């Protein structure tokens, strides 16, 4: 799910640093909003951006939408059941049993919290799916002036999970060849975790050591100036993309405030 989709699209051609700035604008906008309206509008815009500008296939978008809808459900339900109703003069109680109380206000808050989580996941997914890891590292170093050691460290981290996934598959196939079965139920899951944890940890440590030695051998950060084969430049389209998101977020906030739908964390209740 969280993998780079390598194909040509306007979103793929954007400068990663400016794309990251736009994603940061979306994340900050969602962080400040505790109502469902603002996160829902941001989520719709992210979905359309991935589909039209990122040219992500529609079926792929649907596959992404299923976990994107299921992941926030427990968070939304928890917040709906445990909303502090003392803040409301006349809360609308829908259901009550023991310590659990479900109200209209609680559902509104829970839905807002769940949609906020969905926005964070969708924004991260959009960035990862449309950003080449190498371009991202180069952009961090060249455009954002991050030290090369940290910039390429981000690149290594970016590619670390796929490496661990392949290592996991190798270990699983090796166990199958040796006739080691996978037990069922909780006991089987614990046993499988024990068998896989140590080899995966050893592989992670080994790869980290090799990466650190390779970075030291290339003298990252030792010289004041570095030359690059590929230059990452910020074009007009990159700036327009960031401005478009800023204007959209401002418009959504203006609508929410105008119609009394906004519940912002910096505004006293």
What are these regions (language model features)?
Residues 36-37, 57-58, 145-148:
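Membrane-helix interface segments
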Residues 58, 80-87, 249, 253-260:
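Transmembrane helix-loop junctions and nearby membrane-interface residues
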Residues 1-36, 44-53, 166-269:
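Transmembrane alpha-helix interface motif
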Residues 8, 12, 56-60, 97, ...:
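Membrane-helix interfacial "entry" motifs
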Residues 64-179, 183-186:
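Juxtamembrane/interface alpha-helical elements of multi-pass membrane proteins
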Residues 42-49, 135-140:
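Hydrophobic transmembrane alpha-helix segments characteristic of membrane transport
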Residues 35-43, 60-63:
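Short, aromatic-rich membrane-interface segments at the entry and exit
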């Amino acid at each position: 799910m969280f993998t780079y989709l390598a194909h040509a699209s306007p979103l793929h051609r954007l400068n990663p640093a400016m794309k990251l700035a736009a994603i940061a604008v979306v994340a900050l906008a969602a962080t400040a909003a505790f109502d469902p309206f603002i996160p829902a509008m941001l989520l719709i815009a992210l979905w359309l951006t991935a589909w039209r500008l990122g040219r992500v296939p529609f079926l792929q978008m649907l596959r992404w939408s299923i976990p994107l809808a299921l992941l926030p459900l427990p968070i939304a339900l928890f917040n709906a059941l445990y909303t502090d109703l003392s803040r409301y003069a006349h809360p609308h109680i829908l259901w009550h049993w023991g310590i659990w109380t479900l109200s209209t206000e609680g559902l509104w808050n829970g839905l807002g919290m769940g949609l906020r989580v969905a926005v964070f996941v969708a924004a991260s997914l959009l960035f990862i799916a449309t950003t080449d890891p190498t371009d991202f590292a180069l952009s961090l170093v060249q455009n954002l002036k991050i030290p090369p050691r940290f910039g390429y460290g981000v690149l290594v981290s970016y590619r670390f999970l796929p490496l661990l996934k392949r290592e996991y598959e190798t270990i699983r196939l090796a166990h199958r060849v040796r006739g080691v079965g996978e037990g069922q139920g909780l006991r089987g899951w614990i046993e499988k975790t024990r068998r896989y944890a140590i080899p995966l940890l050893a592989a992670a440590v080994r790869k980290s050591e090799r990466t650190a030695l390779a970075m030291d051998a290339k003298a990252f950060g030792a010289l004041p100036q570095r030359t690059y084969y590929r230059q990452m430049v910020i074009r007009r389209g990159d700036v327009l993309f960031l401005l478009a998101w800023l204007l959209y977020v401002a418009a959504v906030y203006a609508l929410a405030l105008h119609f009394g739908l906004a519940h912002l964390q910096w505004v006293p209740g």
